[in-house]
Amino acid sequence: MIGRLLRGGFMTAIYAYLYIPIIILIVNSFNSSRFGINWQGFTTKWYSLLMNNDSLLQAAQHSLTMAVFSATFATLIGSLTAVALYRYRFRGKPFVSGMLFVVMMSPDIVMAISLLVLFMLLGIQLGFWSLLFSHITFCLPFVVVTVYSRLKGFDVRMLEAAKDLGASEFTILRKIILPLAMPAVAAGWVLSFTLSMDDVVVSSFVTGPSYEILPLKIYSMVKVGVSPEVNALATILLVLSLVMVIASQLIARDKTKGNGGDVK
């Protein structure tokens, strides 16, 4: 009994530590007090001010554009890479797998400096393209690992049966592998989108003043105090994230039902 109470209290403390700051942020986005120290009444004026803040909205647009493009390219390349690692044997396969984990485990500052040096050597101007390439680079391994983990759960006999019946490699990929892997592909896209939207360290090294993104804009603003407009923007992003997570879960569940359940 005491152990159960201790476990319950410990879990309650963990969840409170995680979610109370988020709740405070949401509440302060509707607080008429500019400093959010105490409640002075309900208001939506901070959302109105946010809609009129051109620099913040432009940074948000840049971040959304970057996240969509980087997540899409990373998911496309990463899914095909995962299929290649799963289906084929080729020279250097262990090296490719190992390098993916190196990228995942490398500190952000190491990756940021490495990419910056690469762009300087290649003469690439810091801006949209350097930022896009960088975001694809650090999102790619997460997609590969997510999709590859799903592929490892497939029944290989299904693929062998399709091949015995005369199906080409492309047909197997299109008719069997991709439909069954689609929940993992969707999860990889959502994860890549989140990583791109959230990145500060790498982006601060590889972007230029011509293409400012939201995390860097917010970081520069909170140095002098948290603005209520930032609270409002963070609340909107939180709602969008929840919608994306729920949508991805629904898509994954529908795909699983459509394929007759998980393949063991």
UniProtKB/Swiss-Prot annotation:
Bilayer topology: Multi-pass membrane protein
GO BP field: transmembrane transport
Transmembrane parts of this sequence: 10-30, 66-86, 109-129, 131-151, 176-196, 232-252
Keywords, alphabetical: Cell inner membrane, Cell membrane, Membrane, Transmembrane, Transmembrane helix, Transport
Ranges for domain ABC transmembrane type-1: 60-248
SUPFAM superfamilies xrefs: MetI-like
Gene Ontology terms: cellular component: plasma membrane
InterPro entries per record: Bact_Polyamine_Transport (IPR051789), MetI-like (IPR000515), MetI-like_sf (IPR035906)
Superkingdom per UniProt: Bacteria
Subcellular location: Cell inner membrane
UniProt keyword annotation of Glycoprotein present: no
Keyword Magnesium: no
Function according to Swiss-Prot or TrEMBL: Required for the activity of the bacterial periplasmic transport system of putrescine and spermidine.
Family: Belongs to the binding-protein-dependent transport system permease family. CysTW subfamily.
Protein name as annotated: Spermidine/putrescine transport system permease protein PotC
